[in-house]
């Protein structure tokens, strides 16, 4: 679940450093992200080590809504649910019967999931962004303008204007690919999706 925490939960405080961005890529990514006020999808996630050996494979469903709302449910043996109501992030582990609650950090380099659900108007303050396009697919590579980040690069790929995958690579070459399917943009999402009612008797950890 390291990747889930990396994507959805606040990371360590980071120190900004200078970097260069491609203005056209920045504008294009902002435009694609801003087009979707809501997104729902299925996802499959695979984590590989630097040598290409599979470490973990999971699947589930997700939903996001601007500003700052997201729902991420991983199914199967590694079942977990992470929900943001725009103010706080709750991680629910049913096996442990434990809920961990964090304050939502609005900075994109602290909570990368906000690329899909947050304010991206200043995305180039957090990342150095480049892109490449082949046919109807455009891929963006984001490098954090920071030291000691949990990932070295974050890639977002869009096909026909809709996100189809994300990839994170960390400092030791471990790679996580997230493939989205059945993506629906700008469709109503029930408000209850972004509220998590902690089961009675569960352990609650405030961080």
Curated annotation (Swiss-Prot):
TM annotation in the entry: none
Keyword Chaperone: yes
UniProt GO cellular component terms: outer membrane-bounded periplasmic space
Pfam family, one: LolA
Organism superkingdom: Bacteria
Keywords: Chaperone, Periplasm, Protein transport, Signal, Transport
Annotated localization: Periplasm
Record-linked InterPro entries: LolA/LolB/LppX (IPR029046), OM_lipoprot_carrier_LolA-like (IPR004564), OM_lipoprot_carrier_LolA_Pbac (IPR018323)
Span of the signal peptide: 1-21
Keyword Protein transport: yes
GO biological process: lipoprotein localization to outer membrane; lipoprotein transport
Similarity annotation: Belongs to the LolA family.
Function, in words: Participates in the translocation of lipoproteins from the inner membrane to the outer membrane. Only forms a complex with a lipoprotein if the residue after the N-terminal Cys is not an aspartate (The Asp acts as a targeting signal to indicate that the lipoprotein should stay in the inner membrane).
Subunit structure and binding partners: Monomer.
PANTHER family referenced in this protein's UniProt entry, alphabetically: OUTER-MEMBRANE LIPOPROTEIN CARRIER PROTEIN
Name the UniProt record assigns to this protein: Outer-membrane lipoprotein carrier protein
Lineage: Bacteria, Pseudomonadati, Pseudomonadota, Gammaproteobacteria, Pseudomonadales
Gene: lolA
